[in-house]
């Protein structure tokens, strides 16, 4: 009886120790690395900001992201440095980050979270998926809910707007645009614009000046500072006298939660009294 009681006591102590050890492992902050500016913004919006130990070049929002060590840029990924930092989760941009080093990192047992949203709903879904890893899952879910609500408000506000033919201009020499299967085109559509290259089979086609002129856009959407407007107007004059709208570059280009700011900016300019 004493042996049973003693064994039970030891067993209970062991269970408590293991439980405590397991809890401490679970409570240890997850080490996260982001490999693109958009996934960095997603991480902060999902409550994972304090877990980030490194990020990519141009990860500059929110401002504290600028303090993170940079382990990736447009040239590639610093594989050796990432392994040295011992991350447990890597946030990757599918199609933007090279696949081979990501597969090598996965072979080390590192979890890879892929993000490549082409719709506003997919951004919200990415936030919800990140809730699984976040120490603040309610923040991730709240960010997703707020994003959906703000886009729903825009859709309701501009639902009866007569679509205006618009050219989404990315670059000048050469001219690039986007098809209807991208995040940027969806934002344009929500605001009451009609992408003149929506039917392109290529997501990001290079187009000619003549291809644009024949479609007669009333609106040209660009990104950058206000000083770009005059340059674009001069580029198209005298053959095309379309209204030029400029948007905050990071808001519009990054597939992250701040795309709503670009949408609100575009909707306002596209539907003001001067349009």
From Swiss-Prot:
Fe/B12 periplasmic-binding domain segment(s): 31-275
GO-annotated cellular components: periplasmic space
UniProt-listed GO biological process terms: cobalamin transport
Principal place of residence: periplasm
Any one GO MF annotation of this record: cobalamin binding
Signal peptide: 1-27
Entry-linked CDD domains: BtuF
Keyword presence, Repressor: no
Binding positions (cyanocob(III)alamin): 58
Keyword Isomerase found: no
Compartments in which it is found: Periplasm
Disulfide cysteine pairs (residue numbers): 191-267
Job of this protein: Part of the ABC transporter complex BtuCDF involved in vitamin B12 import. Binds vitamin B12 and delivers it to the periplasmic surface of BtuC.
Family, similarity comment: Belongs to the BtuF family.
Designated name of the protein: Vitamin B12-binding protein
């Amino acid at each position: 009886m004493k042996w049973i009681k003693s064994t039970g006591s030891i067993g209970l102590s062991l269970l408590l120790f293991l439980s405590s050890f397991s809890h401490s492992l679970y409570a240890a902050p997850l080490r996260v690395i982001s490999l693109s500016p958009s996934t960095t913004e997603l991480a902060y919006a999902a409550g994972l900001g304090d877990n980030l130990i490194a990020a990519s070049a141009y990860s500059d929002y929110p401002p504290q992201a600028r303090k993170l060590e940079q382990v990736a840029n447009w040239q590639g990924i610093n594989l050796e440095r990432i392994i040295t930092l011992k991350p447990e989760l890597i946030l990757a941009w599918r199609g933007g980050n090279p696949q081979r080093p990501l597969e090598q990192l996965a072979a080390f047992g590192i979890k890879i979270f892929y993000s490549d949203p082409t719709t506003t709903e997919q951004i919200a879904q990415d936030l919800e998926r990140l809730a699984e890893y976040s120490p603040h899952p309610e923040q991730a879910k709240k960010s997703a809910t707020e994003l959906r609500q703000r886009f729903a408000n825009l859709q309701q506000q501009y639902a009866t707007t007569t679509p205006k033919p618009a050219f989404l201009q990315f670059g000048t020499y050469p001219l690039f645009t986007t098809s209807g299967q991208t995040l940027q085109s969806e934002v344009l559509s929500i605001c009451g614009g009609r992408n003149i290259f929506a039917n392109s089979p290529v997501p990001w086609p290079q187009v000619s000046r003549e291809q644009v002129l024949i479609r007669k856009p009333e609106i040209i959407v660009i990104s950058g500072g206000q000083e770009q407007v005059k340059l674009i107007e001069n580029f198209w004059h005298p053959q095309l006298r379309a209204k030029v709208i400029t948007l905050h570059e990071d808001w519009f280009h990054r597939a992250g939660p701040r795309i709503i700011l670009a949408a609100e900016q575009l909707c306002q300019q596209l539907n003001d009294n001067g349009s």
